From Swiss-Prot:
It comes from Clostridium pasteurianum. In the presence of PdxT, forms a dodecamer of heterodimers. This is Pyridoxal 5'-phosphate synthase subunit PdxS. Signal peptide: none annotated. GO terms for molecular function: pyridoxal 5'-phosphate synthase (glutamine hydrolysing) activity. Catalyzes the formation of pyridoxal 5'-phosphate from ribose 5-phosphate (RBP), glyceraldehyde 3-phosphate (G3P) and ammonia. The ammonia is provided by the PdxT subunit. Can also use ribulose 5-phosphate and dihydroxyacetone phosphate as substrates, resulting from enzyme-catalyzed isomerization of RBP and G3P, respectively. The keyword Lyase applies. Disulfide bonds: none annotated. On the 2D-gel the determined pI of this unknown protein is 5.1, its MW is 32.7 kDa.
Amino acid sequence: MGYDINXXLAQMXKGGVIMXXXXXXQAVI
């Protein structure tokens, strides 16, 4: 179970940054 959470957290952080940049525009960066 710990592995699943770690993998999800790692993907969320990477995917979250890309999604936020596209959804919020370049203002985030």
